[in-house]
């Protein structure tokens, strides 16, 4: 993947709420739960993305980007899967943090609060 002509090493990035990656502007990912219906998380993700885009439009922002301000305490992503193809490539996945909003959760109710009801603007999300 490239941003402004520069190649991006996804494995050096940290997931933000399981929806965006640190320091990559206007880029969203949709991945589901490995322990429940895949679409539960994708539904929350799509509604969060729509809410974020509407917020940006209402404020005149063209860029939204999570920034790792040094508090993510990066670790290898814990997807909860033990398939060989996952384990062989896990070092190429984005990292996750030890706590929110960098922690990848496998819990619908925690994600419901964090994606549907939490404030969009915080000290981790950059807008311009």
Question: What are the residue ranges of the model-derived segments?
Answer:
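Alpha-helical scaffolding within the catalytic cores
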Residues: 10-16
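C-terminal, flexible cofactor-proximal segment of oxidoreductases
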Residues: 15, 26-128
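Generic signal for short, ordered secondary-structure residues
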Residues: 6, 24-25
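Glycine-rich beta-alpha-beta "Rossmann" dinucleotide-binding loop(s) and their flanking helix/strand
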Residues: 1-10
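Short glycine/proline-enriched loop/turn "hinge" motifs that connect secondary-structure elements
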Residues: 17-23
């Amino acid at each position: 993947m490239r941003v402004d002509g520069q190649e991006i090493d996804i494995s050096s990035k940290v997931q933000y709420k399981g929806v965006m990656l640190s320091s990559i502007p206007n880029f969203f990912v949709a991945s589901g739960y490995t322990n429940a219906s895949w679409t539960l998380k994708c539904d929350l993700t799509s509604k969060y993305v729509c809410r974020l885009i509407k917020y940006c439009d209402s404020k005149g922002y063209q860029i939204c980007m999570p920034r790792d301000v040094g508090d993510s305490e990066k670790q290898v992503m814990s997807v909860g899967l033990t398939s060989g193809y996952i384990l062989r490539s896990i070092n190429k996945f984005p990292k996750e943090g030890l706590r929110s909003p960098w922690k990848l959760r496998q819990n619908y109710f925690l994600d419901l609060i964090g994606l549907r009801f939490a404030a969009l603007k915080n000290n981790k999300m950059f807008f311009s």
